[in-house]
């Protein structure tokens, strides 16, 4: 069984731990977080406002360990990823979920002994051997030379498979997409200056992002195209993206239009989608039910294609809507690629 260590025990780190309680594919033996309150970490693992309480799993603290159903997870409190004794813990794969660039820069230094791979849960501009997305560019992955791997971002994981399929089957000449993304912890509850927006490593320019996150749709720049380029280099010349932060807590959506090179029909698009879901199970899901965003809470797919809004206009303009759980769905993508990288 593959052994995992998690650096950064925030939303993604805890989601990965909960997902493993469901699937039981790996052993999580170590987590590292700069917050020294181990009881608080255990509390947040057990009680989650978004995903609910762990009702059938026993979570307790014993010294420097969190015990989940009797299985121990040792908790470290190091500020840098290189200071954690991953090798001593027998870790095969370290998941870098802190979001701190310095940890990405140090990732190659911990590839030794038992540690074979580091997965970075965002899309940094440096320190990465390969940006991996199953069903998109996974056939280009080289196990012998790619050791520090980016799992990209939630938005790119949602759009990437759909874009790849449509571009392969019909050709995408140009695309306009808008992401609708729930608020994040660095945003303000009440109006404030940009300096009050707590997001280390980011320099925001638009005053609108300092406004209250719970009362309005907030237009915002997005890193989607930059992240897509790292996985699909040619996509940068075809796609333009914008974003809204929405006054909701979970589940994102992408509303988009592709101008196609090849004329097609809705039946041909639907068939291509069905074939893709069979070739790459678990990546895209097709759904024609009358659902709303919260109904996709806890969905593990990279994205759900809402067939109600899939439309071909005059043969070459494809309208689409995708849904994705920006926390659980993305964490599930990270979780399931671990075994594909070893």
Give residue ranges: language-model regions.
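Acidic-histidine catalytic/liganding microenvironments
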Residues: 23-25, 169, 232, 280, ...
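Short acidic (Asp/Glu) and glycine-rich catalytic loops that position anionic groups and cofactors
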Residues: 205-209, 249-254
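Glycine-rich beta-alpha junction loops
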Residues: 34-36, 124-125, 153-155, 179-187, ...
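Conserved active-site and cofactor/substrate-binding residues in soluble primary-metabolism enzymes
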Residues: 7, 11, 89, 105, ...
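A structural supersecondary motif
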Residues: 230-244
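C-terminal active-site/capping subdomain that shapes the small-molecule cofactor and substrate pocket
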Residues: 240-246, 253-342
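N-terminal Rossmann-like NAD(P) cofactor-binding subdomain of oxidoreductases
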Residues: 1-210, 336
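Small/polar-rich, solvent-exposed N-terminal microdomains that initiate assembly or binding
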Residues: 205, 211-220, 285
């Amino acid at each position: 069984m593959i052994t995992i260590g998690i650096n950064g025990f925030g939303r993604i780190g805890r989601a990965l731990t909960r997902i493993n309680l469901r699937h039981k594919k790996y052993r999580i033996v170590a987590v590292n977080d700069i917050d020294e309150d181990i009881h608080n970490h255990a509390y947040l693992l057990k009680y989650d406002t978004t995903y609910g309480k762990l009702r059938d799993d026993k979570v307790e603290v014993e010294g420097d360990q969190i015990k989940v159903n009797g299985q121990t997870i040792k908790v470290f409190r190091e500020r840098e990823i290189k200071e954690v004794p991953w090798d001593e813990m027998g870790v095969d794969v370290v998941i870098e979920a802190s979001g701190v660039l310095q940890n990405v820069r140090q990732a190659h230094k911990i590839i030794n002994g038992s540690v074979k791979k580091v997965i970075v849960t965002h899309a940094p501009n440096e320190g990465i051997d390969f940006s991996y997305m199953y069903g998109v560019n996974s056939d280009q992955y080289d196990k012998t030379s790619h050791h520090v791997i980016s799992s990209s971002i939630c938005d790119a994981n949602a759009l990437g498979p759909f874009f790849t399929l449509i571009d392969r089957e019909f050709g995408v000449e140009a695309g306009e997409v808008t992401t609708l993304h729930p608020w994040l912890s660095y945003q303000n509850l009440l109006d404030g200056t940009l300096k009050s927006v707590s997001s280390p490593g980011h320099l925001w320019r638009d005053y609108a992002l300092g406004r209250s996150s719970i009362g309005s749709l907030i237009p915002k720049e997005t890193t989607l195209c930059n992240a897509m380029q790292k996985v699909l280099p040619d996509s940068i010349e075809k796609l333009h993206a914008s974003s809204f932060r929405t006054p909701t807590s979970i589940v994102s959506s992408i509303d988009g239009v592709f101008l196609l090179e090849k004329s097609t029909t809705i039946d041909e698009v639907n068939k291509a989608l069905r074939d893709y879901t069979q070739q790459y199970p678990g990546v895209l899901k097709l759904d024609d039910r009358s659902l709303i965003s919260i109904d996709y809470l806890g969905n593990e797919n990279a994205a759900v294609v809402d067939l109600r809004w899939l439309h071909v206009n005059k043969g070459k303009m494809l309208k689409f809507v995708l849904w994705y759980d920006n926390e659980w769905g993305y964490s599930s993508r990270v979780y399931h690629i671990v075994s594909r990288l070893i």
